[in-house]
Amino acid sequence: MKTRAVNHPKIFDLPKLRDRVHVFRDRARAGKVLASMLDEYRGSDALVMGIPAGGTAVAVEIARELHLPLDIAVVSKITLPWNSEAGYGAVAFDGTVMLNEELLSRLNLSDHEIQTGIKKTEQKVARRVTMFRGDRPLPDFKRPIILVDDGLASGFTLRVAIKALRGNGAGNLILAVPTAHSESMQMILEEVEAIYCPNLRSGLSFAVADAYELWSDLGEQDVVRILQGFGNASGAV
């Protein structure tokens, strides 16, 4: 499928899907669309890495379509004590921690509360790494890495994943997301080599779920099922 750069040679989208909602039936369909945009990597030495939970369902379709290996980059936001949906930072699979200092400067959180949140999130990430990857060592990151999520809203967790991958030797990072807000994409643009996003949107209101006809949150067991299904079909994860 032909792609087109938007105002920057590193951004590739699908013009017919710009500023539209409900353009994908589900995450699986979004993954297939992205795979068609990433066809140059078919059968290459690239590695597809999904961000659990939702990104795994997109990533598995890219890996299947392009005959590439699949792995995951576990990342979790550090949530506020009074709001589990909002976060002031994130922790990545290798222990990388990134805090939103601008947000923290506006919050009345004590150092103890901040450190407690970090510790709890580190434990959660470690548990998920074991659940999803077992005791397998980290893969070789010195090859093209296609980092996949189901959408790009604020971009904070993606930035933590990118920082962790860079810290482990990744030199060629390609971000693949079905949908993104244009301003968030600009913020993350210089941190990767290329961004593939079929549904690029702008405006005051943005929700990742609006790109999909069918949307539901995925849990840990959904991720395990997806990874096991891919492993059974391909012989490796």
Question: For the regions a protein language model found, what residue spans apply to each?
Answer:
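PRPP-associated nucleotide enzymes
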Residues: 1-237
